[in-house]
């Protein structure tokens, strides 16, 4: 699957088709900009836990923040919206790639 750039928009294919209602999706996100040292990871963790989204978030050495998360489409879209609403002024770009959900996560964690 080719990687594409998306600024605050869910990529095509993230949205559920008619036969997939209730099935979990997975997205892999790289946020760039001034996204470290502003409470991004802790806010992402709180938003994910509130919405029932599972996965993890971590700072990368190159200054980006990486997020892998799974959940129902509506919850993932609310998660993306929450991050955009709070950190939109800090985010220069967001690369969002849909992936196949694995169900491997029991919660949402901050990786250090």
Can you name each region flagged by the protein language model?
Residues 2-112:
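Intrinsically disordered, low-complexity, mixed-charge
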């Amino acid at each position: 699957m080719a990687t594409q750039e998306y600024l605050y928009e869910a990529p095509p294919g993230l949205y559920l088709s008619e036969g997939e209602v209730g099935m979990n999706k997975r997205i892999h996100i790289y946020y760039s900009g001034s996204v470290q040292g502003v409470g991004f990871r802790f806010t992402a963790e709180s938003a994910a836990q509130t919405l029932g989204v599972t996965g993890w978030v971590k700072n990368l050495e190159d200054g980006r923040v990486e997020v892998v998360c799974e959940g129902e489409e509506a919850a993932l879209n609310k998660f993306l919206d929450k991050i955009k609403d709070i950190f939109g002024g800090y985010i220069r770009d967001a690369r969002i790639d849909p992936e196949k959900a694995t169900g491997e996560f029991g919660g949402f964690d901050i990786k250090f």
